[in-house]
């Protein structure tokens, strides 16, 4: 096989991967838009599970995706319920977990995800963002470094915050709402 033929095969593989992702995107989008007019909360939970499945396919295995959890900080600040929490379960244990009730320390949280359908209540999303911003990591907590652990003063950053992600079906999201989030994922019909 000559070099040109080898390059063509590689390009074909990359094209197949791209097509598979486009197919997956279409399938996920169709699932997200399936309506269940009988019971709204059921549909919301269903959509959260779909978004969680998407993140589960792309995140490293060290992360756990929890649905319907609360974040707590060392000053006893507690968030409102968060649709999806992406956390490092190996780093910090749960504060409390029993059945579906989960309280997760802010230090373990890598990302928080707000899942919305086609109607977004701007006021509640702003409150959600403000609640997340209020939570603080403990100054004396153990900090992760690339492959080491440190406690106490070092040349590292003193605090982190979770990445904020909005997953929605609504295509008309205001700039004000977008500013609350680091990433916005919109499903297209």
Locations of the language-model features?
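Intrinsically disordered, low-complexity Ser/Thr/Pro/Gly-rich regulatory segments
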Residues: 1-81, 86-189
